[in-house]
From Swiss-Prot:
SUPFAM superfamilies found in the cross-reference section: beta-beta-alpha zinc fingers, KRAB domain (Kruppel-associated box)
Region annotated Disordered, chain positions: 110-129
Protein's UniProt name: Zinc finger protein 154
Residues annotated as domain KRAB: 14-88
SMART domains linked: KRAB, ZnF_C2H2
Family per similarity comment: Belongs to the krueppel C2H2-type zinc-finger protein family.
GO MF: DNA-binding transcription factor activity, RNA polymerase II-specific; RNA polymerase II cis-regulatory region sequence-specific DNA binding; zinc ion binding
């Protein structure tokens, strides 16, 4: 069987037999869908390579090339004739389930002497020396057959590579390989600077900019630079106010997907971040970091007025209001103002009657968590406030303050009627009943 050859002054003979793959009908039936897709891709690549070589052999006639099948009619080209110098490429028989279905070459219906009375969906028509290739439903002029192959692959792309774990499909094998690492946890791309590993090489390339300080992506609003384009996109939402990630439970929107995922824990009750010191769980990672300062004793935020230090900047800001007298949180019901937002939220329970804090011992409800803690000492017997004079202890600090007046003789409560003073407010109230008789 004579084989068409391609020769250049610097290269040896190359025939299609060197790259051809042959299947019988029986063998073809044993292949699964992914294997058939792979076969199709390989044959298209090989055929595209051969047909594109005519650009470098403009005056060479390639002659006739036979494609051989082992048994019967295999699913690839039987006999094809390739011409150069802009002439059309024709195929004398194309397997119906292969290239003919793709509209890749002009198909002649019979290789046994029958005359074709119609053209296939894909063909080549010569007009004034320029070859027009009919690509399925899209008739378009291409500069070469290789361009047609690329167009056909775009139009007929199938997602042949399927993940056996989750069923997700991909058009490229390397895309499946990248995805598979999600299930295996494999991170083959390691940073030589810090040892951090990544699933994809592109992620490693972006990460390296942390060490090299390369920040090629600039915000056109404020000039801030970013190492990754994705970070720039997130940053731009600061200027646009865009919040594309909305909670389906409460409608609250977020500028970043990670913030939405963390927020969902509010509704699900999920607290995935555990303190290794005390075992307490938190909804947000940032909350865990703040909490851990309780154990470390770190108090980096110091008040410039009195020198008191705090573990969190937010606590310092709230403390400053003690010195400034600022009370920015105002109750819309009664107009009472508070220095802390949490105090306002608790105060609202006075108007709504809401008592969300329940004692697990007796079932009594309280509007404030602080009130619940004080009450629970009734059940535990805890008396943390001790008098330094006599050693008597109390469940609440207010009880200790009142008791100290026994030792100091202080009587801050004065009767407006007769001027008599009392150490306790309750004693003054009782006394005032004498005047009201």
């Amino acid at each position: 069987m004579a084989a068409a050859t391609l020769r250049t002054p610097t290269q040896g003979t190359v025939t299609f037999e060197d790259v051809a793959v042959h299947f019988s009908w029986e063998e073809w039936g044993l292949l699964d869908e992914a294997q058939r897709c792979l076969y199709r891709d390989v044959m298209l690549e090989n055929l595209a390579l051969l047909t594109s070589l005519d650009v470098h052999h403009q005056k060479q006639h390639l002659g006739e090339k036979h494609f051989r099948s082992n048994v019967g009619r295999a699913l690839f080209v039987k006999t094809c004739t390739f011409h150069v110098s802009g002439e059309p490429s024709t195929c004398r028989e194309v397997g119906k389930d292969f290239l003919a279905k793709l509209g890749f070459l002009h198909q002649q219906a019979a290789h046994t002497g029958e005359q074709s009375n119609s053209k296939s969906d894909g063909g080549a028509i010569s007009h004034r020396g320029k070859t027009h290739y009919n690509c399925g439903e899209h008739t378009k002029a291409f500069s070469g057959k290789h361009t047609l192959v690329q167009q056909q692959r775009t139009l007929t792309t199938e997602r042949c590579y399927i993940c056996s774990e989750c069923g997700k499909s991909f058009s490229k094998s390397y895309s499946l390989n990248d995805h598979w690492r999600l299930h295996t946890g494999e991170k083959p791309y390691e940073c030589r600077e810090c040892g951090k590993s990544f699933r994809q090489s592109s992620s490693l390339i972006q990460h390296r900019r942390v060490h090299t300080a390369v920040r090629p992506h600039e915000c056109d609003e404020c000039g801030k630079l970013f190492s990754n384009k994705s970070n720039l996109i997130k940053h731009r939402r600061v200027h646009t106010g865009e919040r594309p990630y909305e909670c389906s439970e409460c409608g609250k929107s977020f500028s970043q997907r990670s913030a939405l995922l963390q927020h969902r824990g509010v509704h699900t009750g999920e607290r995935p971040y555990e303190c290794s010191e005390c075992g307490k769980f938190f909804t947000y990672h940032s909350s865990l970091i703040k909490h851990q300062k309780v154990h470390s004793g770190s108090r980096p935020y110091e008040c410039s007025e009195c020198g008191k230090s705090f573990s969190q900047n937010s606590s310092l800001i709230e403390h400053h209001r003690v010195h400034t007298g600022e009370r920015p949180y105002k109750c819309s019901e009664c107009g009472k103002s508070f220095s802390q937002r949490s105090a306002l939220l608790q105060h609202r329970g006075v108007h709504t009657g809401e008592r969300p804090y329940e004692c697990s011992e007796c079932g009594k409800f309280f509007p404030y968590s602080s009130s619940l803690r004080k009450h629970q000492r009734v059940h535990t017997g805890s008396r943390p406030y001790e008098c330094s004079e006599c050693g008597k202890s109390f469940t609440q600090n207010s009880g200790l303050i009142k008791h100290r007046r026994v030792h100091t003789g202080e009587k801050p409560y004065e009767c407006t009627e007769c001027g008599k003073s009392f150490s306790h407010n309750s004693s003054l109230i009782k006394h005032q009943r004498i005047h009201s008789r």
